[in-house]
């Protein structure tokens, strides 16, 4: 139950007022919020975050889009949170996202897909370390824990 994932509401999700709805979905699922901040990410930070995409033709546009407004990076914890979180987000391209997923319900176009989620435990660890220091990761026990896990 200690697996962690990195989730970030992108500038379009912030501008459209979807932060609360996104947090609500993760809370309702039973995942535990460990860290959250509201920030305007620097291009340098975004280039590190998306380093694996740096050779792709869309990379400069991606960095500019992510730097166009504030973002809400978060860390969530729970059983299989990386895999389940990705399922909750829906496909990267909203056109392929099922209704009921975050992208399926709230967005239309791949270039404005409102949210980022780690694709593996290893990438989650890297992304969490990039965006948060150890003191920002809060250790706590939710009152509902025993109603979520056996």
Curated annotation (Swiss-Prot):
Its EC number is 2.7.4.6. SMART domains: NDK (SM00562). SUPFAM superfamilies: Nucleoside diphosphate kinase, NDK. Its cofactor is Mg(2+). CDD domains: NDPk_I (cd04413). GO terms for molecular function: ATP binding; kinase activity; magnesium ion binding; nucleoside diphosphate kinase activity. GO terms for cellular component: nuclear microtubule. InterPro entries: NDK-like_dom (IPR034907), NDK-like_dom_sf (IPR036850), Nucleoside_diP_kinase (IPR001564), Nucleoside_diP_kinase_AS (IPR023005). The active site is at 116 (pros-phosphohistidine intermediate). Pfam families: NDK. PROSITE patterns: NDPK (PS00469), NDPK_LIKE (PS51374). It comes from the Eukaryota. ATP binds at residues 10, 58, 86, 92, 103, 113. It catalyses: a 2'-deoxyribonucleoside 5'-diphosphate + ATP = a 2'-deoxyribonucleoside 5'-triphosphate + ADP; a ribonucleoside 5'-diphosphate + ATP = a ribonucleoside 5'-triphosphate + ADP. The keyword Transferase applies. Keywords: ATP-binding, Kinase, Magnesium, Metal-binding, Nucleotide metabolism, Nucleotide-binding, Phosphoprotein, Transferase. GO terms for biological process: CTP biosynthetic process; GTP biosynthetic process; UTP biosynthetic process. Major role in the synthesis of nucleoside triphosphates other than ATP. The ATP gamma phosphate is transferred to the NDP beta phosphate via a ping-pong mechanism, using a phosphorylated active-site intermediate. Homohexamer. NCBIfam families: PRK00668.1. Belongs to the NDK family. This is Nucleoside diphosphate kinase. It comes from Drosophila yakuba. The lineage of its organism: Eukaryota, Metazoa, Ecdysozoa, Arthropoda, Hexapoda.
């Amino acid at each position: 139950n200690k697996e962690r994932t990195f989730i970030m509401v992108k500038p379009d999700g912030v501008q459209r007022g979807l932060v609360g709805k996104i947090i609500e979905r993760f809370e309702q699922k039973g995942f535990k919020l460990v860290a959250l901040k509201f920030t305007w990410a620097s291009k340098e930070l975004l280039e590190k975050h998306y380093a694996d995409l740096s050779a792709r033709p869309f990379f400069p546009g991606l960095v500019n889009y992510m730097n166009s407004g504030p973002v809400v990076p978060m860390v969530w914890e729970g059983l299989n949170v990386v895999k389940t979180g990705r399922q909750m987000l829906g496909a990267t391209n909203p056109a392929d996202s099922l209704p009921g997923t975050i992208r399926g319900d709230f967005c239309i176009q791949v270039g404005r897909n409102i949210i980022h989620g780690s694709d593996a435990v290893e990438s989650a660890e890297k992304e969490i370390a990039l965006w948060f220091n150890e003191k920002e990761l809060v250790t706590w026990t939710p009152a509902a824990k025993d109603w979520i896990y056996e």
